[in-house]
C-alpha cells in the first residue's frame, strides 16, 4: 500500500517481519493467517477509532488492500 506515511520504512518492515514470524512459528496456513489478521484489523478499528469514523476507515483500508493486490499468477 504505497503512500506517504509518518512512519519510517524501517519501522514498518520491522513490525511486518515480527508479525510474519509469529504466523510462521505457529505454522499458520494462509486462510488462518488471513482470518487472524482480519480479526486484528476489526479489533483495532472497533477499539481505537471513533464510532462515527469506523465505516470510513474500514472502507479506506479495503480500497487500499484491493489496490495493493497483484494480478500475476505467482504465489
UniProtKB/Swiss-Prot annotation:
Family named by the database record: Belongs to the UPF0352 family.
Protein name: UPF0352 protein YejL
One Pfam family matching this protein: DUF1414
Amino acid at each position: 500500500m504505497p503512500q506517504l506515511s509518518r512512519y519510517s520504512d524501517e519501522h514498518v518492515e520491522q513490525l511486518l517481519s515480527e508479525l510474519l514470524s509469529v504466523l510462521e512459528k505457529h505454522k499458520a496456513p494462509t486462510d488462518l493467517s488471513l482470518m487472524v489478521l482480519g480479526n486484528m484489523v476489526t479489533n483495532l478499528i472497533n477499539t481505537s477509532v471513533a464510532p462515527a469514523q469506523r465505516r470510513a476507515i474500514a472502507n479506506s483500508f479495503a480500497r487500499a488492500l484491493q489496490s495493493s493486490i497483484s494480478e500475476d499468477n505467482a504465489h
